[in-house]
Amino acid sequence: MSLTARDKSVVNAFWGKIKGKADVVGAEALGRMLTAYPQTKTYFSHWADLSPGSAPVKKHGGVIMGAIGNAVGLMDDLVGGMSGLSDLHAFKLRVDPGNFKILSHNILVTLAIHFPADFTPEVHIAVDKFLAALSAALADKYR
């Protein structure tokens, strides 16, 4: 699924509105994923506390949203721009790439909760397409 120029514009504009709360969104989305999809906890078994709002969940949620923020600036070459993270997740962390879709869903839910007025159908579609493209880029090294 390719991103149109309009999709990219919508994602950029929406990211401008949310970037100040990106850490909060990331922490909540990650906590939501770990609760709703407990099988994803296996990748974080080295954390002492996996509960929503815990320090490790908050920290990693911020890391995730920071990477997504970087990806917003790389929309014209997500595969190349996210190559390092793809390597990390495929070869070192060995994350099942299906989990990228699960996290993307939880990010969308969290964005809709935190930004109800801004999360219009057009924004929803564009951000969903962007996260799907990002997930595909992160899964690129799995092939």
UniProtKB/Swiss-Prot annotation:
Keywords of this entry: Heme, Iron, Metal-binding, Oxygen transport, Transport
Entry annotated with the keyword Kinase: no
Tissue: Red blood cells.
Binding-site positions, heme b: H89
Record InterPro entries: Globin, Globin-like_sf, Globin/Proto, Hemoglobin_a-typ, Hemoglobin_oxygen_transport
Entry GO CC: blood microparticle; haptoglobin-hemoglobin complex; hemoglobin complex
GO terms under biological process: hydrogen peroxide catabolic process
Family annotation (PROSITE patterns): GLOBIN (PS01033)
Oligomeric form and interacting partners: Heterotetramer of two alpha chains and two beta chains.
Function: Involved in oxygen transport from gills to the various peripheral tissues.
Name the record gives this protein: Hemoglobin subunit alpha
Species this protein is from: Salmo salar (Atlantic salmon)
